[in-house]
Amino acid sequence: MRPEDLDEVLGIERASFSMPWSRGAFLYEIQQNRVARCWVMRDEERVVGYLCLWEVSDEVHITNIAVRPESRRRGLGRTLLGGVLDDARQRQIRLVVLEVRPSNTQARTLYESFGFRVVGRRRGYYYDTGEDALVMENDLQTARPGTRA
């Protein structure tokens, strides 16, 4: 992700989340946060999705993933997440963690299809609604048969 991608990224972010990240938050991640990495996915002309993460030691924490609303249900989120997990495996990352709203069943289904499992709950995590966050993790060292984990 580059600063010149941010207008499109912010459009996707605002269309995807009730608590969108700001331009400043994305700029911090791509310019100053030494543990952050962010990618964009493009079609021929535009950004169609993105993913941001933090990498610390042998763990990855996925902080943000979204796909342009009109491009959803085409496997783009699956491609983004799969690419990150493949990269993590190659670099011998042990654990991938993320938070998700319990009400976000589409995202949960995607994560579960890659071998993520619920390991905890953060009470009142989403301040806009007070909804909890489910903490999901994927232990890349103990992948289960039939998953990409």
Residue ranges: model-predicted function:
Residues 3-70, 81-91, 120, 139-149:
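Acetyl-CoA-dependent GNAT
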Residues 78, 131-140:
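Accessory recognition modules or surfaces
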Residues 64, 68-82, 89-91, 95, ...:
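Conserved glycine-rich acetyl-CoA-binding loop
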Residues 99, 112, 117-134:
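Conserved catalytic-core motifs of GNAT/GCN5-like acyltransferases
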